[in-house]
Amino acid sequence: MTTRKPEELEGVTLLGNQGTNYLFDYAPQVLETFPNKHTNRDYFVKFNCPEFTSLCPQTGQPDFATVYISYIPNEIMVESKSLKLYLFSFRNHGDFHEDCMNIIMNDLIELMDPRYIEVWGKFTPRGGISIDPYTNYGKPGTKYEEMASYRMMNHDMYPETIDNR
């Protein structure tokens, strides 16, 4: 039994759709939302996306990452299948790691207007170097703006070792 009213699910068209169209080029328009039924409290929603792929803008070589997206929702939330398809749309998108993470965060801010959001990409090494861009945002003029500043200063306090990648 669902606690969602049909009108709350009107914008959710991809979930349960067997004819899913996988887009291979950057496509923010696939993102869908649904209402947050718990706006009276703060809570984190975290997505772990271990199969993110994009292309190096210079060489066209594939880059692979696990992307972590954590956010405190405001009025609306991102639907997970649409997020999966959106992230998949980076498959043929050529951009640097840092750009991809900021694009994802900017698109999700525009889509949801969250109280707080952070996006962290842990890319596999290429040329012997791994790059782990982290970006975050707190709604200006709120406690979440302070939270973003604090988390930025303290986000990665543990040096990388072979067993925590």
Curated annotation (Swiss-Prot):
The keyword Cytoplasm applies. GO terms for molecular function: preQ1 synthase activity. The active site is at residues 56, 63. Its EC number is 1.7.1.13. The keyword Oxidoreductase applies. Pathway: tRNA modification; tRNA-queuosine biosynthesis. It is found in: Cytoplasm. Gene3D superfamilies: 3.30.1130.10. InterPro entries: GTP-CH-I_C/QueF (IPR043133), NADPH_dep_7-cyano-7-deazaG_red (IPR050084), QueF (IPR029500), QueF_type1 (IPR016856). GO terms for cellular component: cytoplasm. GO terms for biological process: queuosine biosynthetic process; tRNA modification. Its main location: cytoplasm. It holds the Pfam family QueF. It catalyses: 7-aminomethyl-7-carbaguanine + 2 NADP(+) = 7-cyano-7-deazaguanine + 2 NADPH + 3 H(+). Keywords: Cytoplasm, NADP, Oxidoreductase, Queuosine biosynthesis. Catalyzes the NADPH-dependent reduction of 7-cyano-7-deazaguanine (preQ0) to 7-aminomethyl-7-deazaguanine (preQ1). PANTHER family: NADPH-DEPENDENT 7-CYANO-7-DEAZAGUANINE REDUCTASE. HAMAP family: QueF_type1 (MF_00818). NCBIfam families: QueF-II. This is NADPH-dependent 7-cyano-7-deazaguanine reductase. It comes from Bacillus pumilus (strain SAFR-032). The gene is queF.
